[in-house]
């Protein structure tokens, strides 16, 4: 089975504090350490000099062992709670998965 890269690109709503953003990413890190099938998690602000981010300011990437691990994560209750909290702060979100 192929690994899956789960990519989230985010533009937070105006007025969202750095502390709120850090908490969201820390909570996703905690989640990634407790959900089976997640091999890696990285997150941070956009640092591209190309100017093609279309306002997206932050992102994260999770690497899953396979598509079934990703699918289990998507319906995980802790993920659902965290997603709800995150979406309250998000103006724009793009999710893109790549099978390796």
Task: Please tell me what each predicted stretch does.
Residues 1-57, 65-75, 99-100:
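Short S/T/G/P-rich N-terminal loop/turn motif that feeds into the first structured element of a domain
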Residues 37-41, 85-98:
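Conserved short beta-strand edge segments in small beta-sheet-based binding/regulatory domains
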Residues 67-92:
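C-terminal structural segments of small proteins and small subunits
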């Amino acid at each position: 089975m192929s690994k899956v890269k789960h990519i989230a690109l985010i533009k937070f709503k105006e007025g969202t504090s750095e502390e709120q953003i850090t908490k969201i990413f820390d909570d996703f890190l905690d989640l990634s350490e407790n959900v089976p099938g997640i091999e890696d998690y990285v997150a941070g602000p956009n640092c591209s000099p190309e100017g093609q981010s279309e306002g997206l300011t932050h992102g994260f990437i999770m690497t899953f062992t396979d598509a079934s691990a990703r699918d289990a994560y998507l319906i995980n209750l802790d993920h659902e709670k965290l997603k709800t909290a995150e979406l309250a702060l998000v103006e724009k979100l793009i999710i893109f998965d790549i099978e390796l």
